[in-house]
Amino acid sequence: RETAPKGANPDMWDVDKKGEVISDDKEFGGKSIGVPGSVKGFLYVLEKYGNLDRKAVIQPAIDLANNGYRVSAIMNMDMKNQMNNILKYPATAKIYLKNGKPYNVGDLLKNPDLAKTMEKIVKDGEKAFYEGEVAEAIVKATVAAKGKMTLEDLKNYKIKISDPVKGTYRGYEIYTAAPPSSGGAHIIQILNILENYDMKNIPAGSARYYHLLSESMKMAFADRAKFMGDTDFIKIPL
């Protein structure tokens, strides 16, 4: 997964008296961008465990980006909800807006620049993304948005192999992503709370069902806010 750029530090955020970040910089803009790990991670898994080559795996996505795909109702809603943020970044607006407005449901959306990037990855592997033209474009855009990423950050990115988090639910073993990903551990926590109730006989969609689910999630998210983090730096009571 992504990592913080080497130049990231607590002082880059504006915080209030409680230590909470005042602006939305932690969600949008250059400061919120980590050094991307997906490309290197996916290629590692493909090489170690796969039996297809890069072209066979990536070509369908290239075709989709070049030929386009139909905008769904959910995507249309997301475009409308994020209009203000999309408009801040011309390159993003060029892709996800049509004449300055969200694409309509059913419109064809193409992303040829993404296709070109994936074609480079097919040809040259991870180096095509973490060095050279693509890396330079990533850093340029990030720095322009007040981010901290450098070419060195990209070139030096290393994947980390972690043991999965393991839990149980009604006799089933569950294996899921380890921290700093928070979803896995807290999904197990939520399930462990819910297994104290006879969920099988509580109608899905009923008030009782949603009440138990929301209360379980509330407790999990409270623990997430208090304890979750990166195990390279803190100890987490898993």
Please give the residue ranges for each predicted region.
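Noncatalytic scaffold domains of N-terminal-nucleophile
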Residues: R1-E131, A135-A178, S182
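A structural signal for alpha-helix termini and helix-coil/disorder junctions
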Residues: K48, N67, K120, A144, ...
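Internal maturation/activation junctions in enzymes
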Residues: Y197-L238
